[in-house]
Amino acid sequence: MSTDKLKVMVLDDEPIVCKRVQPALEKLGYEVESYTDSHAAMHRIQETEYDIIVTDLKMKGIDGMQFLQEAKKRSPRTEVIVITGFATLETAKESFHKGVFDFIAKPFKLSEIQEVVNKAAAKLRGTTT
């Protein structure tokens, strides 16, 4: 993990989510790549290690649970944050069981995403917010 700009992936099949979240995180100094295609994102995590991944759960193509499992398998230190419009207690429990850092229900405020990503970054850097 680098000590300067942390590398973040945003994956959501709704383009508006990526369009809003990417600049909000870049403004905080993160290096951000966003994807609306889960297959393209899965290919990308095979070649690049991300510090933090923000992913939707319900997507066309590769399901978010499957994606986060593969991401954690490839890079156990990667912190995964789940965003979903289908938030249930069962889904949240399953996400945490699979190593998710945090779980955010849609609709969300950009400040919520920024706060959770900052907390994940602090954990990676060994500091607190």
Residues covered by each model-derived region:
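C-terminal output helix
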Residues: 108-118
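Acidic catalytic/metal-coordinating carboxylates
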Residues: 36-37, 63-66
